[in-house]
């Protein structure tokens, strides 16, 4: 018998629970609204901000104070662009941060839809890595990879952009696999040659 199907929004919350995330920061808005419904039944504490930039800085401060991954959630367009300053700050301060942003429906991307912004492009210089989800099935694995990238090597921010239709898409939960990212190998040991040159 197959498992019950979950919406992409439910997968977001279930994935955060799977990753032992206890606290997230954010501000609801149209494109990310579906992700707020499953939070009612979740043990994850949501701290409501009055502005996305503030929620991003709160998540960053939380990560710095606790040593845990900071998580911030925002809507599309201006909601996502308001995260650029906290993302850049987290990048400069080596703070592990996961930003989850809503996006207009997949078929509307690139058509100047209401509150559409090219979030992945806008945040490339402000993050270690970013993702645009194209299927709800990707959500658990991508969020686990995002956490891995944000917390390993030199810590920093990772953004996951999720179109609204993907948040509403129903699929089965697929438990994330072990992280295997052949192209991502953070340097953990200092280079002795570079240390000698600096001295």
Show which residues each predicted segment covers.
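N-terminal alpha/beta PP-like core and its mobile active-site loop of ThDP/TPP-dependent enzymes
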Residues: 1-199
């Amino acid at each position: 018998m197959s498992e019950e199907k979950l919406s992409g929004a439910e997968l977001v919350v279930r994935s955060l629970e799977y990753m032992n995330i206890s606290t997230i920061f954010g501000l609801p808005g149209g494109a990310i609204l579906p992700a707020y419904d499953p939070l009612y039944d979740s043990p994850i504490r949501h701290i409501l901000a009055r502005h996305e930039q503030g929620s991003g800085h709160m998540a960053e401060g939380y990560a710095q104070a606790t040593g845990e991954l900071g998580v911030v959630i925002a809507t599309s367009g201006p909601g996502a662009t308001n995260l650029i300053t906290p993302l850049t700050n987290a990048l400069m301060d080596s703070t592990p941060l996961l930003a989850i942003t809503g996006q207009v429906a997949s078929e509307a991307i690139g058509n100047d839809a209401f509150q559409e912004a090219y979030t992945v492009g806008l945040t490339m210089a402000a993050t270690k890595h970013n993702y645009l989800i194209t299927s709800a099935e990707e959500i658990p694995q991508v969020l686990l990879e995002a956490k891995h990238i944000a917390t390993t090597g030199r810590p920093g921010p990772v953004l996951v952009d999720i179109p609204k239709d993907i948040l509403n898409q129903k699929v089965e939960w697929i438990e994330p696999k072990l992280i295997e990212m052949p192209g991502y190998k953070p340097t953990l040991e200092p280079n002795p040659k570079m240390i000698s040159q600096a001295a």
